[in-house]
Regions:
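Active-site-proximal helix/loop microenvironment
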Residues: 1-41
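Structured C-terminal helix/loop/strand segments within mature extracytoplasmic catalytic/sensor domains
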Residues: 34-136
């Protein structure tokens, strides 16, 4: 339940939906989350460990709209898609991934982005529950 002014909340939401990002900036944000909230360039803590854990959990369970459950089983990488075709993904302690593909499926997720992430997950053993994912 939202407990703030509706107009202010909608204004904030529209502003967040209107941000211009690149695949590189999405990957950079993913890398920040993959590193536990510590900026890889400066070593400065930007996000608390609790915040990082909550964000990655929500990404895994809800980040791909109504396709989140299937995506979690098949790909297993915490990800957040946007209706502009971007996907931000986090591989804990390893990497951030940023992808753009403008064609969307019926659930609002990038068709090409999902395919790329599925391929990377399988080939590099990136699934969060893959026993090989903990080895380098």
């Amino acid at each position: 339940m939202i407990r703030s002014d509706v107009e202010r909340t909608l204004d904030f939401y529209v502003r967040m939906c209107s941000l211009s990002v690149t695949a590189e900036s999405l990957a950079g944000l993913g890398l920040l989350l993959a590193g536990g909230g510590i900026c890889p360039a400066t070593g400065e803590r930007l996000l608390s460990p609790d915040t990082v854990r909550v964000v990655k959990t929500i990404m895994l369970t809800c980040g791909m709209y109504d396709g989140s459950g299937t995506f979690a089983v098949q790909v297993g990488i915490p990800s957040k898609s946007g209706v502009g075709g971007g996907i931000l993904s986090v591989v804990d302690r390893r990497m951030g991934i940023g992808i753009f593909g403008p064609a969307l499926d019926g659930k609002g997720n990038s068709v090409a982005g999902e395919r790329v992430l599925r391929h990377l997950s399988q080939q590099l053993h990136l699934h969060i529950f893959d026993t090989d994912s903990q080895t380098d």
